[in-house]
C-alpha cells in the first residue's frame, strides 16, 4: 500500500525550509510515501522562502496558497488560511481515493499551525506535529500546561521575578526570566496552553533534535519519568536545508573575503531573518568588536519598530558612517566586513569562522553545531531565551551575551546590551582551546552520526513512517 501525507508548515523561511528538508528525507526513506506540502505565503516579501518550493519533485509536490490579508498577528493569519487549506486537503483526498493502491495517511502540521488539526479530524485523518524547535522546549510547553491545568499555577505571574523552577526535560533549574514573552503575557498565555493541549491530541510529534543531544528530554518522553497523555515523540534531527540560496554575487564576495582570513580567526554575527537592532545598539556592538581585537563578519540590519503585531522584517541602514562610532569603518577596514544579508550555511562552513554570535533560532543552533562552531548566545524573540539557556547552562555549547534579552512585538522598549557584555561573550566563544569548543566538536560528531543508517534519528524516522502506515484508518 502506498501512503500520502499532507504537510502544513508555518509561513516564514526557517519553518518552510525545515519542513521541506523533512519531507525530502521522508520520501527518500520509503518508496511507499508521497508528500503534498501546502505553503502558506509569508506575511512579508521573502524571496528566500520562495526559492525553496519552486519545483516539485517525484513524490513531493508543493501547493502555494494565494496571499491573504497580512496585517494581523501570526496566529490570526494562519487561522485565516483554514478554508483554503481545507479545500486543498479535500482535493488531495479525492485524488488519492481514485487510486486503489493508495491511502491518505494523515496531516503533519507545524508547531504553530495547530488550528489545522481540526481539518484532519474532519477528514478522519491522523494528525501529527512537526516541532521545529528542540525536545527540551517541547517539555517546557507540556510542563507549563500541566502546572496550570493540574495545579492552577500560572507561570505568566513569574514575570519580572528571579524565580527558578524545575522542568522535567532539563537537568538545571530554569530561570523564569528566560521564559518566552508569550508565556509571560496574560493575553497570550491561553494560546500557549491551547497549543500544548492540541499537541497531546495528535498521533505523534516529530522533533528537530537528536537523542544524544537531549537525553534528559528523550528519556522523559519515552515514559522514563511516568509522564502520561503525551503522544510518541520522534527525534529525527538535525533537519536542515544546507543548500546555498540568495544573491549569488554577494555570496561569492563574502566567501572570497573569508578565504583570505586565517583559520578560526573570524567571529560571525548574524541574527536571523527577523533580527535587527537600533542605532544605539549597533554602536555598542561596534565598540565590542573593536575592543575584542578579533576579525569579524557582521550581518547588520535596522530593527523594525517595536510593538508592531504585523512584525515587519528588518530594514537596511542607509549610511553606516552616521550610526557607527566615528572612524570605526576606517580603523577596522583590514579586519572586518559589514554586510546586510549573509549566506549563513556557507559562512559557518568556512574554516575562517571561529565563533558565531547568534539569536539562538533553533535552525541556526543546529547549523552552528553541524559545522562545529561555538556560539555566543544573544536571543531576540520566540523561544530563543529558552534556547540560549539550553545552550549556555544546560549543555555548555555557547557563551552568553545576554540570555534574557528580548525584542519582539510584546516588548515596548528593549534594553541596550552593553559593549562590555558583548565583548565578554565574543572573547569567550572565540577562545581556541576551551572546554566549550571541545564539547561543540563532540556534539558535531553526534549530530552527523544520528543521520547515518542505523543512527538514532535515522531509526526514529523509519519508526515514524511505519507508525503512519499502521495508523491509517
UniProtKB/Swiss-Prot annotation:
UniProt GO MF annotations: flavonol 3-O-glucosyltransferase activity; quercetin 3-O-glucosyltransferase activity; UDP-glucosyltransferase activity
Q: Which Gene3D superfamilies does the protein's record reference?
A: Glycogen Phosphorylase B
**Amino acids binding UDP-alpha-D-glucose:** 132, 342, 344, 359, 362-364, 367, 383-384
Q: Where is the active site?
A: 15 (proton acceptor), 110 (charge relay)
At the top of the EC hierarchy, this enzyme's class is transferase
State its Enzyme Commission number(s). 2.4.1.-, 2.4.1.91
What InterPro entries does UniProt report for this protein, alphabetically? UDP-glycosyltransf_plant (IPR050481), UDP_glucos_trans (IPR002213), UDP_glycos_trans_CS (IPR035595)
Q: Which reaction does it catalyse?
A: a flavonol + UDP-alpha-D-glucose = a flavonol 3-O-beta-D-glucoside + UDP + H(+)
Q: Which residues bind an anthocyanidin?
A: 15, 382
User: What keywords are assigned to this protein?
Assistant: Glycosyltransferase, Transferase
What role does this protein play?
Possesses quercetin 3-O-glucosyltransferase activity in vitro. Also active in vitro on benzoates and benzoate derivatives.
The UniProt entry's sequence similarity note says: Belongs to the UDP-glycosyltransferase family.
Q: What is this protein called?
A: UDP-glycosyltransferase 71B1
Species whose genome carries this gene? Arabidopsis thaliana
Please name the gene that encodes this protein. UGT71B1
Amino acid at each position: 500500500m502506498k501512503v500520502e501525507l499532507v504537510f502544513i508548515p508555518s509561513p516564514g523561511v526557517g519553518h518552510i525550509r525545515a519542513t521541506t528538508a523533512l519531507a525530502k528525507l521522508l520520501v527518500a526513506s520509503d518508496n511507499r510515501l508521497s508528500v503534498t506540502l501546502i505553503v502558506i505565503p509569508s506575511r512579508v516579501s521573502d524571496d528566500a522562502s520562495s526559492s525553496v518550493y519552486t519545483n516539485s519533485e517525484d513524490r513531493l509536490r508543493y501547493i502555494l496558497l494565494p496571499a491573504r490579508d497580512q496585517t494581523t498577528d501570526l496566529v490570526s493569519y494562519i487561522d485565516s488560511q483554514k478554508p483554503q487549506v481545507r479545500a486543498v486537503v479535500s482535493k488531495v483526498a479525492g485524488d488519492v481515493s481514485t487510486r486503489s493502491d493508495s491511502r491518505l495517511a494523515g496531516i503533519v502540521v507545524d508547531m504553530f499551525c495547530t488550528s489545522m488539526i481540526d481539518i484532519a479530524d474532519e477528514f478522519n485523518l491522523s494528525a501529527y506535529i512537526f516541532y521545529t524547535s528542540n525536545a527540551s522546549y517541547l517539555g517546557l510547553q507540556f510542563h507549563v500546561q500541566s502546572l496550570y491545568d493540574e495545579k492552577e499555577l500560572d507561570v505568566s505571574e513569574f514575570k519580572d521575578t528571579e524565580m527558578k523552577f524545575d522542568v522535567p526535560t532539563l537537568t538545571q533549574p530554569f530561570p523564569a526570566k528566560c521564559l518566552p514573552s508569550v508565556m509571560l503575557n496574560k493575553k497570550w498565555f491561553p494560546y500557549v496552553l491551547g497549543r500544548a493541549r492540541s499537541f497531546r491530541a495528535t498521533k505523534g510529534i516529530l522533533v528537530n533534535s537528536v537523542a544524544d543531544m537531549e537525553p534528559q528530554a528523550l528519556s522523559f518522553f519515552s515514559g522514563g519519568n511516568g509522564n502520561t497523555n503525551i503522544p510518541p515523540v520522534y527525534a529525527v534531527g538535525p533537519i536542515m536545508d544546507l543548500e546555498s540560496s540568495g544573491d549569488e554575487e554577494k555570496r561569492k564576495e563574502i566567501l572570497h573575503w573569508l578565504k583570505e582570513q586565517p583559520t578560526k580567526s573570524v567571529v560571525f554575527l548574524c541574527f536571523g531573518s527577523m533580527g535587527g537592532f537600533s542605532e544605539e545598539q549597533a554602536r555598542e556592538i561596534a565598540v565590542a568588536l573593536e575592543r575584542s581585537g578579533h576579525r569579524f563578519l557582521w550581518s547588520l540590519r535596522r530593527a523594525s519598530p517595536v510593538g508592531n503585531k504585523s512584525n515587519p522584517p528588518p530594514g537596511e541602514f542607509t549610511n553606516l558612517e552616521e550610526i557607527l562610532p566615528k572612524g570605526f569603518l576606517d580603523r577596522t577596514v583590514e579586519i572586518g566586513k559589514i554586510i546586510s544579508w549573509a549566506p549563513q550555511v556557507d559562512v559557518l562552513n568556512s574554516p575562517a569562522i571561529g565563533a558565531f554570535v547568534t539569536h539562538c533560532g533553533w535552525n541556526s543552533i543546529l547549523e552552528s553545531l553541524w559545522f562545529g562552531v561555538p556560539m555566543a548566545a544573544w536571543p531576540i524573540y520566540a523561544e530563543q531565551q529558552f534556547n540560549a539557556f539550553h545552550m549556555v547552562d544546560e549543555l555548555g555549547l555557547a557563551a552568553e551575551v545576554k540570555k534574557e534579552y528580548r525584542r519582539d512585538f510584546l516588548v515596548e522598549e528593549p534594553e541596550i546590551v552593553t559593549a562590555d557584555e558583548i565583548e565578554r561573550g565574543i572573547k569567550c566563544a572565540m577562545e581556541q582551546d576551551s572546554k566549550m569548543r571541545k564539547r561543540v566538536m563532540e556534539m558535531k560528531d553526534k549530530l552527523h552520526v544520528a543521520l547515518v543508517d542505523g543512527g538514532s534519528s535515522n531509526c526514529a524516522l523509519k519508526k515514524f513512517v511505519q507508525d503512519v502506515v499502521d495508523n491509517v484508518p
